[in-house]
Regions:
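General beta-strand structural signal in soluble alpha/beta enzymes
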Residues: 1-4, 11, 138-140
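Active-site C-terminal subdomain of aminotransferase-like
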Residues: 6-92, 96
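Flexible, glycine/charged-enriched surface loops at secondary-structure junctions
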Residues: 74-82, 96-105, 141-142, 178-179
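Small/polar glycine-rich anion-binding or flexible loop at a beta-alpha turn
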Residues: 87, 106-112, 143-151
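Conserved PLP-binding catalytic core of the aspartate aminotransferase-like
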Residues: 100-133
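A common structural junction motif
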Residues: 131-138, 171-177
Length: 179
């Protein structure tokens, strides 16, 4: 398993979380390919003596400690339920604007929503206006979806007011782009 501090942990980028099965460790030990940049065995050796192999991002560790405390105080069931409610609110906002989702609802995420760009709307212009005029940062599509979709993240501590603000800005932005 792999994760990163900015992926729902309510922490800035800077930490990676990795977990390996016994089988994965055996495969690593038997692998012969060179390890030029990152070797998990190095981290494992240092972990066993209670130290990191290099200077860690200490402030990010403190942020993680605080975020984990907040999640435990809220309760994990409530954290997961909050993400479901946020996803439902975002999907309702998408529908209210007459937009369509990229994925089928059966496989839609509770942490990010991919939305098809409306016909005739330039995605780069939309993202720029959202950012520059409304202080709202959305993500575009990647690779084959570049210029075809945009993504609304609702991962971590996202309130109803945050979501409503995104859709207020999006409504204004789409109206401006449609002329």
């Amino acid at each position: 398993m792999a994760s990163a501090s900015q992926k729902g942990w309510m922490v800035p980028p800077g930490l990676a979380f990795l977990s390996f099965s016994a089988e994965a460790w055996r495969a690593h030990a038997e692998a012969s390919m060179p390890r030029f940049y990152f070797d998990v065995a190095e981290y494992k050796r240092y972990f066993e003596i209670g130290q990191p192999p290099w200077t860690p991002g200490v402030s990010v560790h403190y942020a993680l400690d605080k975020a984990l405390s907040m999640m435990l105080d809220e309760g994990l069931d409530e954290v997961f339920s909050r993400h479901v409610r946020a996803a439902e609110r975002v999907r309702a906002g998408v529908a209210d604007l007459g937009l369509s989702l990229l994925p089928d609802l059966s496989c839609a995420s509770n942490t990010i929503t991919a939305v098809n760009l409306p016909e005739g709307i330039n995605g780069a212009d939309m993202l720029r206006i959202m950012r520059e005029e409304h202080d709202v940062v959305l993500a575009g599509g990647q690779q084959s979806l570049s210029g075809k979709i945009f993504r609304i993240g609702h991962l971590g501590l996202v309130s109803d007011e945050d979501i409503d603000g995104v859709f207020s800005a999006l409504k204004l932005t789409l109206a401006k782009l449609r002329g």
